[in-house]
Amino acid sequence: MVLHGAAALFIPLVLAVVLWYVLITIASYYQRIQIRNTHIPYGIALFLAILTSLFFFFLLIEIIRDNVSEFLVTLPVYQAKLQSFILEAEKIPFVRGIDINELSNQIDLSAIVTAIVGGVNTLTSYTAATMLYTLFILLECRSFNTKIDRLFPDTEKRKKVSGVIQRINTQIQEYVRIQTFVSALTAALVYVLLLLFGVQYAAFWALLTFVLNFIPTIGSMIASVFPPLFALMQFESVAPVLILAVLIVVIQFSIGSILQPRLMGSLLNLSPLAILIGLAFWGTIWGIPGMFLCIPILVIANIIFANFSSTYWISVLLSGNEKVS
């Protein structure tokens, strides 16, 4: 498949488009700031948005580096505790039919950590190309409207194309804004909870929660598993681990299933089945980056398909209700 074979080209390009939306969304917040009754100019706001993004990017890398290096030192201790716990579980009646030794051998913490770090490395490996693409997109924005006028001299066609682009911009920016807020809120609550329980590497687990919540459906599930799993190896008793697991699930459910739908409303208008299939498709051909980019790609595709009679039926299938974007 072309998309899979050219992943090194397309992934940074799509990431750059998403990053561009992130930057202009942050810049719009800076533009709301008034200094002596004057709003911050767009150029300065965009520069501040770039600095903000770079700050959080390097903060993310620093947190991962510090926590992973510290965790690797204590990894043998955690591995021994996990195997001891699994062997103790053999005494439980309904577990006796399970091959405990095989299960113990299959659970490798170093492999789990390697997978997490590998996923992060995959994303960061595209950093240089993504930043370069983003720079050129920012430079092209200045002449974008002029090019649209030249490409579509017919007034009606130009209005239609401009309307499609405007809807894409509005929905993607709103998605970035709401999803970032929801993920940050979830991560903050999980971080406080982990601190209260005394779980080690709370900052790392909170960061992982923030990042994974951008992956639809399965991201929050994965984020709910790791902190209790590692707390199980830290605490002597199972009771606090179970309470911690329940509270994390409550946080994820309350925000993901109650707050987020209220904030999103009918913004995305995507079928849950379409999201699941899209997640599987883009995850298969582009791996973890594809999972993160699944929603923006589906939103853009849905709006474009809805505006052409030959592809309108695809938009109907992608939409979450009878009203097509």
Can you name each region flagged by the protein language model?
Residues V241-S325:
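Hydrophobic alpha-helical transmembrane segments of membrane transport and translocation systems
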